[in-house]
Amino acid sequence: MSVGFITIDEHGDIYLDPDTPPVSNPNFIEEIHRNLRLTEKFGLLTEFHDEEYIVESFDHPLHIIAIEFKEKKIFLQTKQNTLFQADNSKWSVDEWDRFNGLTTSYSPFVLTEKAQAQLFNLADSYDDEGFVADNEYIATPPYYIDSPQIESPQYWVNVYQSEGNPGWNLNEAAEAFKDMLPRIKFPKSRILVLGCGEGHDAAFLARAGHLVTAVDFSKEALARGKEKYKDLTNLHFFESDIFQLPQDWNFSFDVVVEHTCFCAIPPDKRSDLVRLYRRMLHEEGQLLAVFFAMEKRSGPPFGSTEWEIRKRTEQGFHYLFWGRLRNSIPSRMGRELFVLAKKKKD
């Protein structure tokens, strides 16, 4: 089967082509919804008219507008009137107190405000940890699953040493940067690469003539990068926790690069990371980013939605470009979001 793309916007509307109106045929919607499934790489696929499609969903793909409790089961109705049953072991709540979860067919959903209000009205009781439906307690843990070990530099050293070539290490610059940098045509810039790993993105930018500072707190990754790219005199590797960068770096970079850092840190530090982007950039500075948009609660790498990424960045940045990449490497196809954004003035 050939592979195409289907887009689901922030309201849950489905598009076969972003330049045409959303799909309105109930049978088509039903088919697309029913065939939704998570891949092993935590992307989304569906089938429609015997063809397979990668699903690019701005938020969790199923937007639930109504719920029903019946015989210890919870039934969900999408805005297009497709009906699903919730997997009562897969509920969670995000940082913005939105309830979400998986259906019994393993499709991700999020409750609209209307549906969430209805849930509270129907529940026998509820507390900060969950709710009771038909005398059954349904836990709603935080969406992201805590992984405290990732805050230790030794954890990352161990991964590099045990795996040799960790899954995030492409041994080359990200396809997005190779594709987009010639189009953007930055003038010679001071660029900061956060969580640089072995420095492949940083080296690519340095070879394009920029003055690049690459930061990581894995000694192993930095040692590899320094050896591999020792010929680049305009590339400087710096060992540090990104949240402990020198104060005299503040407001001194033209561009901050994000690629596999946002997904690698504890998700409860993501807003701190966005503030760090802004702190490192001068008033006209820009964020050059590849984020992972995928349905993955554990990590690293932790997933995120475009909804979350926008929620965290919209107060601090003007978006110059925002879009999914369709020239990714196969293992990342449909899950990479390219963002170019300019720092908002205080």
Q: What is the role of each PLM region?
A:
Residues 257:
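A conserved beta-strand element that flanks and buttresses the S-adenosyl-L-methionine
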